[in-house]
Amino acid sequence: MPWALLLLTLLTHSAVSVVQAGLTQPPSVSKGLRQTATLTCTGNSNIVGNQGAAWLQQHQGHPPKLLSYRNNNRPSGISERFSASRSGNTASLTITGLQPEDEADYYCSALDSSLSA
């Protein structure tokens, strides 16, 4: 079986239009099939520390898909291979057992805690 690398591109996204969250992520992560990749997102304590982060996956030509929100809450239908966590001001998304379809852009998004639904 040929060995393949997956490139996971990380993009920082703030869902707050007035106040930028100041989130930072490494530009990319490359791993082999069936390996584990961990993506990180660091921001200020008012955003990542209080609210956690949402993680989204986007394949080229398709809209973003929500993978996780407020730390490790997964929407229905999202595989348990995607697991989010937070330590201090750093949010992480871990993808286990990487599959070809995991090659995508990943967005870390933060919400302003002063916003209400």
Curated annotation (Swiss-Prot):
Region of interest (Framework-2), residue spans: 53-69
Region (Framework-1) residue spans: 20-43
Region (Complementarity-determining-2): 70-72
Segments for region (Framework-3): 73-108
PROSITE patterns reported for this sequence: IG_LIKE
A single BP term in Gene Ontology: immune response
Region (Complementarity-determining-3): 109-117
Keyword Cell membrane found: yes
Protein name per its UniProtKB record: Immunoglobulin lambda variable 10-54
Organism for this UniProt entry: Homo sapiens
Annotated gene: IGLV10-54
